[in-house]
């Protein structure tokens, strides 16, 4: 009986270690394309470091992720990019400067018409 218990404990530990290894997979980076009225916005999302990069006002911005009640929010306290589902907006100094952004399936595709996938 003692030998059976020892084998079970070893197998159980091995199973836990294998499952723990599965959670170490790093999320991939993504390039997201938005249509914001007549303006296109491209956002590079670095999931490993929880930040996004985008070009606004002729400047390359890198915004770290910050706490949000809902959606994903990135801010450097001057610029803010906030997305939820397939929609997003951009603020500068707490004023919305780009609104009504809809995620595109690819840069050349039509807008996802209000669908949350």
From Swiss-Prot:
**Localization per Swiss-Prot or TrEMBL:** Cell outer membrane
UniProtKB keywords:
Cell outer membrane, Disulfide bond, Lipoprotein, Membrane, Palmitate, Signal
Please state the span of the N-terminal signal peptide per the UniProt entry: 1-21
- PROSITE patterns from the UniProt entry: PROKAR_LIPOPROTEIN
Lipid-anchored residues (S-diacylglycerol cysteine):
22
Residues the UniProt record annotates as site (Directly involved in lysozyme active site inhibition): 70, 84
Family statement drawn from the similarity comment of this UniProt entry = Belongs to the MliC family. Type 1 subfamily.
Function of the protein: Specifically inhibits C-type lysozymes.
Please give the name of this protein: Membrane-bound lysozyme inhibitor of C-type lysozyme
Q: Which organism is this entry from? A: Yersinia enterocolitica serotype O:8 / biotype 1B (strain NCTC 13174 / 8081)
Q: Which gene encodes it?
A: mliC
């Amino acid at each position: 009986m003692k030998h059976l218990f020892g084998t079970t404990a070893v197998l159980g530990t091995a199973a836990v270690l294998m499952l723990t290894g599965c959670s170490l997979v790093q999320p991939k980076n993504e390039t997201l394309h938005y249509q914001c009225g007549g303006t296109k916005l491209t956002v590079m999302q670095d999931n490993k470091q929880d930040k996004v990069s985008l070009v606004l006002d002729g400047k390359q911005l890198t915004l770290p992720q910050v706490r949000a009640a809902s959606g994903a929010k990135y801010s450097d306290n001057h610029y803010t990019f906030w997305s939820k589902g397939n929609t997003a907006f951009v603020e500068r100094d707490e004023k919305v400067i780009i609104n009504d952004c809809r995620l595109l399936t690819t840069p050349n595709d039509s807008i996802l018409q209000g669908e949350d996938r």
